[in-house]
């Protein structure tokens, strides 16, 4: 068979076409890898909390002051309540008794004092201390007369004032010192001043002729010269020294007295070798020291009495002299023991202002 070139080309083209067929399948692309697991973002650190403010440190002095003010307010309230009750006690019958006590005639100051000791005008409870305080013996030793002009330095709660007032009302004169009742509200001295004021006001019949001289504790001035026959300071001297005013008070007493006048001191007696700066904090002073100080102001020692001595007083208590009766500062702790000791051992000194 004759194969032409055209035929050959045709055959070759068919063969090529058959060989080509359908194109080979295209391999599918591998699936994409799974996404990487999402990591949770790290937890944010908690916001810093502001530091709590540190409370200010307690100021011991401020706390002490607050406690003192609270106690002062409590004591002021108690004082006013007691004064109200005492004023109410002075009814018409008691006022009449006071007038009769003052009007009566007595042969001596001692007799007048003994009559006053029995009076119902005395603050309830005060008579309980007569045996320990010896008021008649003290005042007779100091030379009290019914005609005397007497200055009482520091009336306190009026223990001596209510005895002296009726004795001197008719022929003599009683002058007492007190702190300002209108002083600063945060001062305990103001309480003391108010207490004296309330005492004087409760009975014009008893205290109407008593003069009150208001003094400044830090600068005591009586404003009296050469008029007094007797100046007394009963259980006051330790406080004078503790406040650095011992010399000032003694100088005022000297100035106020007539020549020949008497300065009478009753004070808690320390051990002979005691340091007065330290013993005064406990309420006591050495007797020799007191004598030396008073004589250095111009006085002469006119006599000593042991009427107020108490050998049971050991003078070494936790709360000083205030551990003993009548204060009993420890309350019920060892109360029977301190009651058995009794009131303090006291010096009783009579000084005389020399005549010109």
Model regions and ranges:
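Class I SAM-dependent methyltransferase Rossmann-like catalytic core
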Residues: 108-141, 145
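Conserved beta-strand signature within the Rossmann-like core of class I S-adenosyl-L-methionine
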Residues: 174-178, 260-269
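Conserved class I S-adenosyl-L-methionine
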Residues: 145-156
